[in-house]
A protein has these predicted regions:
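An anionic oxygen-ligand recognition environment, strongly enriched in 2H phosphoesterase
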Residues: 95
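Short, conserved glycine- and acidic-residue-centered signature motifs
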Residues: 98, 102
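N-terminal, polar/charged subdomain of small-to-medium soluble alpha/beta proteins
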Residues: 1-88, 92, 104-154
């Protein structure tokens, strides 16, 4: 499971011209779900997003986390994050989870985030979304929690 996190002073996601979610200072996280991802990957990714130290302390060093700052978290599903771009001129999406399990895992991640932190907002899985954001820094990181090594046995 992948999160591309960006430190922002504000971020908003709109669907069909209507604001779906909005935060002030905090993290915008674009989320990609891979085929073998499950609840363990979602939970670990959430912990990393909440505890990753990307906010400045009093000395200006990145020593504070989202939990420390009580900043907002905007989760936006984005399946192209798991694209294979190693060759050719067109991305391949064979690593991406199918829509139904990806949606379920994104919703699980969102629910866990809302239970663990506030404020949390989100985009809509499968919708065409428009994002407005102001990067702070800019500070952008790629967080990845590898999928399970093998598919669960039947």
């Amino acid at each position: 499971m992948i999160a591309l996190i960006q430190r922002v002073t504000m971020a908003r996601v709109q669907v069909a011209g209507r604001t779906q979610g909005e935060i002030g200072a905090g993290l915008l996280a674009l989320i990609g779900v891979e085929q073998l991802d499950g609840p363990a990957q979602a939970q670990r990714l959430l912990e990393r997003m909440l505890d990753y130290r990307v906010f400045p302390d009093d000395a200006g060093r990145m020593n504070r986390s989202l939990r420390d700052t009580a900043g907002g978290l905007l989760l936006v599903p984005q399946f192209p994050l798991v694209a294979d771009t190693a060759s050719g001129n067109r991305p391949g999406f064979s690593r991406a989870a199918a829509p139904a399990p990806a949606r379920a895992l994104f919703e699980q991640l969102l629910g866990a985030a809302q239970a663990a932190h506030a404020p949390v907002a989100a985009g809509i899985f499968g919708a065409h979304m428009e994002l407005t954001l102001t990067n702070d820094g800019p500070v952008t990181f790629w967080l990845a929690v590898p999928p399970a090594a093998t598919a669960p046995e039947a």
